[in-house]
């Protein structure tokens, strides 16, 4: 099976220049592909696919425009991957799965340096370093995290990315699938929410990490840093003496705080999923939440976004497939919170402010725990 490993790297100054040059070229090619297809559309011509654009770029455009020779100085695999990503963006737009593709902006868009294993000497990994095509050996900050090549593991492909002044490598490694022992326990249901991140049907409650003093302190620092950055931009508009270098320094501070908060939230999700899977349930049932609809509520949108429900579902699906656990997804219209787990009566007048479920049969239970138990026992579901 293929598994991705992402860790921070410590490149040299020369390697940093190559990474910046490759990422900048990939961003330019992505935007050029979008612009070229827009021109063809305005001229009444047909859409150009990624393969056709790659042939046209190398055989017609670059020979006639020698001033763009720098495109050939970076890895061809990275350039082709940028074209494929742009073609995928158009394909999603044509199938009404996303909006029209937008240009990638420097410093704001997520662009990566893609690499692939072309020969046996490429993508070789040791305990403390990894060999990347066009970069050579790059030191790893977390030693031993990526499986070493000497142990028989093969890196198929990967990508180098930047975020908040740090450099990361993501490697797709071919590893043997773990063998399921078959000693599963009873199935569980998980109710996700804003008061608590997750409530499991066995009574386990995972707290909302965004309500901790640690996150609130970082968010307070972030607000101050953003106000400071905003004042620098305002002073620049007024013509006052504000250096661009100071703006870049303050922008990096804001990015680092964003990155720190994101890492804490992601780490919390990973730990929750790991703890749930280690109980070895026969099945896990979750609800198909309407995240896009919840985000339209301006009073709840920030809280919903900070919980990262979609990331939780994606990682839980991967982990369940890895350990042979069945992941069940219940329809979003299933009234898990309104059904009494004792007598199956539906309480239609249940409000969002009612945190305790009280049924006419005498059953009294926490609202989220009652919903988790109903999800566990749901009979209509889809296997993810």
Q: What feature does the model see in each segment?
A:
Residues 3, 148-151, 163-384:
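Positively charged, helix-rich recognition surfaces that bind polyanionic ligands
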Residues 4-8, 137, 157, 187:
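Well-ordered beta-strand positions in beta-sheet-rich domains
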Residues 1-80:
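Gly/serine-rich nucleotide phosphate-binding loop at the start of the catalytic core
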Residues 33, 82-93, 369-383:
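Stable alpha-helical structural segments in soluble proteins, enriched in small hydrophobic residues
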Residues 38-42, 94-100, 282, 320-327:
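Surface-exposed helix-capping loop/turn segments at secondary-structure junctions
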